[in-house]
Amino acid sequence: MAYAYLFKYIIIGDTGVGKSCLLLQFTDKRFQPVHDLTIGVEFGARMITIDGKQIKLQIWDTAGQESFRSITRSYYRGAAGALLVYDITRRDTFNHLTTWLEDARQHSNSNMVIMLIGNKSDLESRREVKKEEGEAFAREHGLIFMETSAKTASNVEEAFINTAKEIYEKIQEGVFDINNEANGIKIGPQHAATNATHAGNQGGQQAGGGCC
């Protein structure tokens, strides 16, 4: 299917926070309770619609282990959006956010949109990190924030789509150079065709005007 833009995402965070489950829920609308540890990087894609335009999300799901951190870093460079995930039932995953964020900002383009996600909101009885703490961290670092549940699908759709909306707004504002694919944005065939049609119509109008 033709698309106007392609946005590249990267999902980052500690091992076991539910990164692969979030991706699977978003792309396949299913939950897999037992998931093998991601080795290196996995990949998923899905089409969404923003402002009447088809946008393809290309999502890279990274390994959380320290031993794969160098591989993860190489994927930051071409990403327009990042989902930084922690587990609300494990405080250590929240405590490590600063390290992940520093790493992301050091190795990515400065305009990358980052969504902070507190995952496993369905496990309220085991919560170790208050929602207010997530909100405060996001505010302090200029991130978008949501709590999600990959199991129940709560806010999963919204997390991916709201990140895309933010990227799309930055394109409209001229913040992103869409001709530089290093920014994690690619102009699709649909967008190019629309522009060509628009240019053709303008040319036709001008030619018609000249004949009068």
Curated annotation (Swiss-Prot):
Quote the record's binding site residues for GTP.
Answer: 16-21, 38, 64, 119-120, 122, 150-151
Q: How does it sit in the membrane?
A: Lipid-anchor
**Residues at which Mg(2+) binds:** 20, 38, 61
Q: Where is this motif: Switch 2?
A: 63-72
Q: Where does GDP bind?
A: 16, 18-21, 119-120, 122, 150-151
| SMART domains on file | RAB, RAN, RAS, RHO
Q: Which GO terms describe its cellular component?
A: acrosomal vesicle; autophagosome membrane; cytosol; endoplasmic reticulum membrane; endoplasmic reticulum-Golgi intermediate compartment membrane; extracellular exosome; Golgi apparatus; Golgi membrane
Q: Which Pfam families match?
A: Ras
Sites of S-geranylgeranyl cysteine lipid attachment are 211-212
Name the GO terms of the biological process aspect. autophagosome-lysosome fusion; endoplasmic reticulum to Golgi vesicle-mediated transport; Golgi organization; macroautophagy; protein transport; vesicle-mediated transport
PTM summary from the entry reads:
Prenylated. Prenylation is required for association with cellular membranes.
Partners and quaternary state? Answer: Interacts with PRKCI. Interacts with TRIP11. Interacts (in GTP-bound form) with GARIN1B. Interacts (GTP-bound) with HOPS complex component VPS39; interaction contributes to obtaining a functional HOPS complex that promotes autophagosome-lysosome membrane fusion driven by STX17-SNAP29-VAMP8. In contrast with mouse ortholog, not able to interact with VPS41.
Q: Give the comment on domains.
A: Switch I, switch II and the interswitch regions are characteristic of Rab GTPases and mediate the interactions with Rab downstream effectors. The switch regions undergo conformational changes upon nucleotide binding which drives interaction with specific sets of effector proteins, with most effectors only binding to GTP-bound Rab.
Q: What does this protein do?
A: The small GTPases Rab are key regulators of intracellular membrane trafficking, from the formation of transport vesicles to their fusion with membranes. Rabs cycle between active GTP-bound and inactive GDP-bound states. In their active state, drive transport of vesicular carriers from donor organelles to acceptor organelles to regulate the membrane traffic that maintains organelle identity and morphology.
Quote the protein name from its UniProt record. Answer: Ras-related protein Rab-2A
Q: Please name the gene that encodes this protein.
A: RAB2A
